[in-house]
Each structure stands twice: as structure tokens, then as C-alpha cells.
Amino acid sequence: KCAKAIDQILHTPVSGYFYGINTTLEKAVVIEACKLGLHITTAESCTGGLAAGAITAVPGSSAVFDGGVVTYSNDMKKKLLGVRDETLRDFGAVSPETAGEMALGAIKLTGADIAVSVTGIAGPGGGTEEKPVGLVYIAAASKAGVTDHPSHPVLCHPSASVCSHFTSGDTDVTVLRCQFSDSRERVRTLSVKSALA
């Protein structure tokens, strides 16, 4: 009984953090993908490849991670991931719509089973009243029937909330809205941790 209670406490998000024993979030992602025989990919903007870097830092990650893309500019979001002009024009690069299209595009580009995308305003400049510094959208996409992750995302930070869920063809997409604070590096680090959760 005691061990079960301790395990539950250690695996519950507390103040935006996860606690575990003898592992990291990145390693847990790779191990779980290996167990399930799934391939994962990333599409990143404000994190500039940090999520892909975190995954590939895990030995054996090549069994589940074929690659990811960094699409910092709108032009690259369109060219590499197929984000639509009208999406960027009507909603902007930092929006749930763009995050969702980035994740869909990453699956189409790589053939992966699961994709996570991250787009946001890491700061210190660039924020507005409507879209302040620290605003980040994270999309999780999976081919239908592959996993329940997008349908039941882990809200790994107190500011995280589901803001969109849709299906496109055979792919389910869930988008989280997060509002982080602190330094540029902290925003980027929390974005990666939230994307991998």
C-alpha cells in the first residue's frame, strides 16, 4: 500500500514538475515508444530543435526517432510542413491552428505515428497584449488508433489547458495552450518538457 501511494505521489505533476525514479522524461518517452513500436517526430519553432535534441540524447532513440524539423520562419512552416497561408494570415504563427497544422505536416513529412509541435513567443521581446511573451501552443498528433495521448494529454504545467481537438483524415490532434513566465531559456525548457509529457 505504502509503495503504491509513494509511486502515485512521485508520478503526479506538482507545480509544473514531474517526479520519477531512475529515469528522465525523455528516456521514458523513448522507452514507451520502443515498447509500443511507434515512431515519433517533432516540428519546432520557438524551441529551435531542443525537443529533438532531448529525444536524441537518449541512447537507442534511433529506434523510434527518424527526425524532426525546425521551422522558425513562416516560410519554412509553409514549405516543409504545409502550414496554409490563410492559417498564418488569419491566426498567426503563434496559434492553436498553426500548431495543429505543424504537427499534421510533421506526420505527413516523416511518416511517424506520433508528432509533437511547438510554436510560441519565447521572449524577451515580441509579445503583445493578445499574445504575451511566454505564450506557447503545443500540438500532439497521432494516427487514429495508435495511442490515446492526444485525446488525453498530460497537463504538465499549471498554465496548460486543452484549447483545440480535431481529426484530420486518420490523424487525431490535440493542442495545448501554455503561458510560461521567466527567461527565454526557461520558456523554451518548459515548452520541451510539456511537449514530451
Language-model-detected regions and their locations in the chain:
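Short alpha-helical segments enriched in small residues
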Residues: 2, 6-197
